[in-house]
Amino acid sequence: MTGKIEIITISDAVRLAEKGAELMHNAAGEAVARKDSFAVAVSGGSTPRAMHRLLSQEPYLSDMPWQKTHFFWVDERMVPFDHPDSNYGAAQKDLMSMIPIPADQVYPMPAMMRPEEGADLYQAKLKTFFQDLGSLDPVFDLIILGIGTDGHTASLFPGLQIRRRIAGF
């Protein structure tokens, strides 16, 4: 994918899932051709679930470069992974358990600790991953975000007061 921003408007949920799977497939192919790996960050909620289910089926099941794909999350609920509200748990059920991806290339956010501790641990994991690729900054090949009916994305809700924290990458 290029650095150019393209806005695609799709009003049908089924077509949205199909387009998302297609875009992810294309981004993965381009990233692997360019640098031999694909780093994607996904959100939770209902938006990506249909896309995840499509990616776990043909033609994506056998055509995606799963062995070179690395999955990260943009947000997580502070619940066990087997809880119905877990973003990782939903992705595990709909996608990860169905595809041939090495377990050490799936990076769920720590959910069973204080949020600040989990954020620090995840930041360190991201830093190590991207430094090992030779990048000083975390630059994902693709970030997939959903938008809730109230306008929230990645657990950032309208009107939510966010405590600013300086993070050193």
Cite the ranges covered by each PLM segment:
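Short, well-ordered amphipathic alpha-helices
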Residues: 24-27, 50-60, 92-93, 123-130
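Short glycine-rich or small-residue beta-strand-to-loop segments that form or flank ligand, phosphate
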Residues: 39-43, 72-75
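Glycine-rich beta-strand-to-loop/alpha-helix junction loops that act as flexible
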Residues: 42-47, 145-149
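A glycine- and small-aliphatic-rich helix-loop capping segment at beta-alpha/alpha-beta transitions
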Residues: 53-64, 89, 93, 158-167
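Class I SAM-dependent methyltransferase SAM-binding "motif I" and its flanking Rossmann-like core
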Residues: 145-169
